């Protein structure tokens, strides 16, 4: 696996992990269009199941008290700033259930079930639509045509931080770190086979508070099919962040047998009070 540590992000109010030799993209328009909601997937028909013997009823586990839930979370998160209180709509028990910090907020982060600890499994050209190759629920997918039989597969989704269990005072006063990570296949289909674009948006989902764009070029060394990691941490981005718009592109090439793809896996967006 090859790790790409990039850091020169576009947009003010951010610090990056460190330097790296990557090709940066020009700034995007200030108001990127949020992805439309994907159509709901139809529910599969229910099949009658054979009668099963009744299992003995087990007692439900005891729910933690509000004080115990607070203690458990603060042990996990670390101390908060003095005076930071929960809004009335949230309780510590609800936060313990949602766990909005230190977890991946993206839906279907590994749609094709690929293991990054092994080389990308060999695959040939295919004529099957991408949506039939895995579970892409939560992603909005489109194709961007290029020249010379090439194209981008563009996948994006928008994370609602308040809906995930975070709250305004935490985001504005603490400004926890927001970490974005992704893995792409070194497919050798072109010099640049992957792009990452992330916007931190205000409540209107149009005002850009901070952004990061990167188009890495791999070294070309080693066997093809290895996984390359891209990551970035947003810090000190300023108050008002309510949404995270995550978008990545993977390059394809049309061949006689169909489309040969660059695969992406283990995409993640997470929020941390400490790293």
From Swiss-Prot:
UniProt biased composition (Pro residues): 26-62
Any single Gene Ontology cellular-component annotation: cytoplasm
Compartment annotation: Cytoplasm
UniProt modified residues of type Phosphoserine: 31, 37, 49
Tissue expression pattern: Expressed in the esophagus, oral cavity, skin, tongue and reproductive organs.
Domain FBA: 95-273
Pfam families, sorted: FBA
Gene3D superfamilies xrefs: Galactose-binding domain-like
Renumbered residue ranges of the record's region Disordered: 1-67
Keywords assigned: Cytoplasm, Phosphoprotein
SMART domains named in the record: FBA
Domain of life: Eukaryota
Any one GO biological process: SCF-dependent proteasomal ubiquitin-dependent protein catabolic process
Function noted in UniProt: Promotes cell proliferation.
The protein's name: F-box only protein 50
Gene: NCCRP1
